[in-house]
Design a protein with these regions (language model features):
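Sec-dependent N-terminal signal peptides
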Residues: 13-19
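Electropositive
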Residues: 26-139, 143
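N-terminal targeting pre-sequences for secretion and organelle import
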Residues: 148-188
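Bacterial N-terminal signal peptides that target proteins for export
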Residues: 2-12
Length: 188
């Protein structure tokens, strides 16, 4: 009888441990929100825990614009082509990072914008801060009007300074127009 009790106890403990580990794997392995698509260099759409799609604008940074309309895609205007070329590079880099992170991100939502998008610091499961990478590689600029709402303000400024000093990405392009200036001048 004692042998039977030990055997049942062993299997009961083993079952509890296995079920517990399966639950932990689900929580750890699939943590974060699923990225449905990368809209551009500073905007993604994620599916939250309830299955709802949420548009997320990256906090603290502004990436170059991408062409949205056929007219923009066919534009021969040099400022358009320049902006859109850098915009596509930023978008592709975000797509690459998201794929490396298993199509999941962790959001630190800091605000909502006038378009109803959530504004957030976006990190991969391994902790990689996407905005920091974009800035370090010269694929975005710090968006100064909103830096005070940015919990990682110091990291943002350091990453941008690093790219600027090394003349990486947009910092190497003397014809590049800041995204906010481009929108004000050309997107009316």
């Amino acid at each position: 009888m004692e042998k039977l009790i030990k055997l049942v106890g062993f299997w009961l403990c083993a079952t509890i441990i296995i079920l517990g580990l399966m639950g932990c794997d689900r929580l750890i392995g699939n943590s974060g929100d699923v990225v449905e698509r990368v809209s551009d260099g500073d905007t993604i759409v994620v599916k939250d825990a309830n299955g709802k799609n949420i548009t997320v604008r990256f906090a603290c940074v502004d990436a170059p614009e991408i062409a949205h309309t056929n007219k923009e895609k066919q534009s021969k205007i040099s400022s358009d082509r320049n902006q859109f070329t850098w915009g596509v590079k930023a978008q592709e880099r975000v797509q690459e990072l998201v794929q490396q992170g298993g199509d999941r991100v962790t959001l630190n939502i800091t605000d909502s914008d006038r378009y109803g998008r959530k504004v957030a610091e976006v990190r991969l499961k391994n902790g990689t801060f996407i905005q920091q990478v974009l800035l370090q590689e010269g694929l975005a600029k710090a968006y100064r009007p909103y830096l005070n709402k940015c919990p990682s303000k110091d990291l943002i400024q350091q990453a941008e300074a690093q790219a600027k000093n090394q003349k990486l990405g947009i910092w190497s392009d003397t014809k590049f127009v800041n995204p906010w200036e481009y929108r004000a001048l050309y997107k009316k």
